[in-house]
Amino acid sequence: MHAFRTHTCAELTKDAVGQTVRLSGWVHRVRDHGGVLFIDLRDHYGMTQVLCDPDSPVFSQVEKVRSEWCIRIDGTVKARDESLINPKIPTGEIEVFIRDMEVLGTAEELPLPVFGDQEYPEETRLKYRFLDLRRESLHDNIMLRSKVVQSIRKRMWDIDFTEFQTPIITASSPEGARDFLVPSRLHPGKFYALPQAPQQFKQLIMVGGFDKYFQIAPCFRDEDPRADRSPTDFYQLDLEMSFVSQQDVFDTIQPVIAGIFEEFGGGRRVDTDWPLISYRDSALWYGTDKPDLRNPIKMQIVSDHFAGSGFAIFAKLLEQEGTEIRAIPAPGGGSRKFCDRMNKFAQEQGLPGMGYIFWRDQGQGMEAAGPLAKNIGPERTEAIRQQLGLQVGDAAFFLGGKPASFEAVAGRARTVIGEELGLIDQDRFAFAWIVDFPMYEKDDEGRIDFSHNPFSMPQGGMAALEGDPLEVLGYQYDLACNGYELVSGAIRNHKLDIMYKAFEIAGYGADEVEKRFGGMVNAFKYGPPPHGGCAAGIDRIVMLLADTANIREVIMFPMNQRAEDLMMNAPSEPTGEQLRDLSLRVIPQE
């Protein structure tokens, strides 16, 4: 007999009745029923009920067992009485009578119980993550992640992609976040960086003559945490292809992503129609570049109905250049109570408020109500209703100004309206490609900077770069699903003259480009092929499949919101010897 087990805790069925078996696992819980001790014994695979009566030679030992002790038992498999069968577990038709037991590991008083789904503070869960991982929901999430990664690999191999590994220690490069720097012992005063993404390396793989590359790549970014983003590191399906157009990339990755969601989505509907929406239209209609298309609400510009109207705030606002009035339809939101609640929401988001109109049945016909309706009159309110396609019982909310001043709040309001009015289908995955991203934007100081990936090919090539930088569009694209960005990619700029010009517009001289991207600049002198690709966030994919809003629920050992590993006490202070080896000195903060 094996030293620890003949079967797992999910394996025994009625076919094993009468057999002597050996099981090992953790004590999930102990119950005393009339002097007979019942133990739910748990391992990675499942649960088996084992019991010990006073006639057992190890009864006195079993009495001492507590939750989460690790034990090995030998016993006889018996069938449960018909009335005691548990159909919820594979072993629910049998139980094992203990005849021998060995304690493999005791457990101190638990800082959080493994049994049950009671919520505990996240700090406690992260400090004792090894215990938290034993809990069924988190254990299942981590196993789901493993299966998703395995399936992704197989799907990529099946379409002739080759998996390569790229360096983890490399040079710093501007990719939208802060680098994690690594001091060099052999080169005092110089630093490596952990890669924010394998961006340059995967492009160099294409220059190296390989056709289709992928890897499940770790990425390191010193970012502020969010619920859907880890503050230090994450994993992505990274891929690149030679001799491809933007549509080729879509046609390649779409079946992979759709297949993963169909395989692991638990029966939820996976949309087959993935519309292409321009970045500007997405911002206009949804207030974000990662829209949730399960929500049917589509915002519209209604400036014409307020220009010269009796609502002076909007009328005067529209006299300023670059302003507009945008409407958020709310089907079924036609009550003053709901409208007032949404107005308060806008105020909580830092805006003065949100105007509204709602339509009600007055017996003699439809009537528009609310402060705006009184100020602009029945003809304008009726024109708004017809434009938005609203009926009795519906409402519309209005925000005005320059789009940058209210667009994000409008997007959040659209989400809240959809959630509160029950408009969002929770059993659906809705995808959309967001395309035609602007190449450049102005930073907080008014300087031109890259808005996304600096290595993207501008639409129109060199000619486009000769005009207004803020009008230049790139061959950049994102895939949004249910309000999250899942995939981001681009057709790359493989022409050195266009690359130099693109960086020059963003304030990088040729010398700096060569210094920071010397490897790629040098490679592009030797016949670089047209190429493009994308990366899909593994963490976010699994987060959606697991139906959780917190990315830490699908990462085995995540950091907390302050980028701390409470279990391993990281970050920690280096020793003096370590600092001397690296020729470093810590300057205390004042």
Swiss-Prot record:
SUPFAM superfamilies noted in UniProt: Class II aaRS and biotin synthetases, GAD domain-like, Nucleic acid-binding proteins
Region (Aspartate): 199-202
Binding residues for L-aspartate: E175, R221, H452, R492
GO function term, MF aspect, one: aspartate-tRNA ligase activity
Gene3D superfamilies named among the record's database cross-references: Bira Bifunctional Protein, Domain 2, GAD-like domain, Nucleic acid-binding proteins
Keywords: Aminoacyl-tRNA synthetase, ATP-binding, Cytoplasm, Ligase, Nucleotide-binding, Protein biosynthesis
Segments crossing the lipid bilayer: none
GO biological process: aspartyl-tRNA aminoacylation
Locations listed in the record: Cytoplasm
EC numbers: 6.1.1.23
Keyword Translocase among UniProt keywords: no
Subunit structure: Homodimer.
Protein name, as recorded: Aspartate--tRNA(Asp/Asn) ligase
Organism encoding this protein: Dinoroseobacter shibae (strain DSM 16493 / NCIMB 14021 / DFL 12)
UniProt gene name: aspS
